[in-house]
């Protein structure tokens, strides 16, 4: 299409020239005493056109001649840039391939070439950025080689170049790498400081949050680790199962870190409602409260959501979780001030009637009856639960309780047999 348009334009110019020059009788007379030169107007126009063409070509030739040194310098600069970029690719390729010595050597060669270009008077617009990246690759290789002095030297240089004029992403990448190296060195406080220096936006990225979680756990900052894990779960950086496992472990760690009932209650209040409803967290917190001599009624209040879930079967509790929950309630009932109130009596009785075949609930109901000195009812419930209990510790304690009931009623033969069965379980 373009060629056709050019041909049409050429034909138009030819037609216009033919119409103008074909019937043009004009002439130009040049007086140069004692001479007189007569020239046709068409010839003069052709000569002027040729003159301007020659002048233009001469100007182009002179411009090209004087531009040769500059073009040669640009060509050399492009060749150096190409070599520098190839060396940078070699550094990255060797680094991911595990050839750390070669990667470090290639990254350092990039730095040498950049300095050579700048010493020649040329300025690279991306100079600070490529220098920061090269120092970062060299530091990564030195870190893999356990060369800590070399790593720190390249890290400081990378930070300087990243702060001098590189893009913000480069500086953030350098800080993230430095935080990861600090974690590898087991220096959690330095890692947290570097992550704090990132700022609000970069510090909430998934990679930064993962490192913050690891550093907080390493530094035994359970509250900070718990907050970070919540952010990761909110951003869906962890699967639902993994998030629940991490939150559960951190919540239990926070509970175990309390050394008196006041600290434990403060730690419990720092947990979310969902975390408090986790069966493992609730039972561990209630058990820890009883160990510290806390209020048994408060421990049962903490256990109430897990109890309701177990009874209503809204969530599936494992057999171990059910046993742990019942054991914690039993321990609270056994304390001096832990006698079950009317509310818990109604809950246990209702749960046992709704699930008459559940041996764990029968065991708990029997223990509650013993605490209230209802010996006959307790003996009946414990005997019914004994045949279906699978947990060895519950079976052993059931035999022990039956032995105590037999001694209470004066049946020494039954008590002896029950004690023997408890010892054999």
Which residues are covered by each model-predicted region?
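Alpha-helical adaptor scaffolds
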Residues: 146-147, 159, 171-180, 315-391
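Structural register within alpha-helical repeat arrays
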Residues: 90, 131, 138, 178, ...
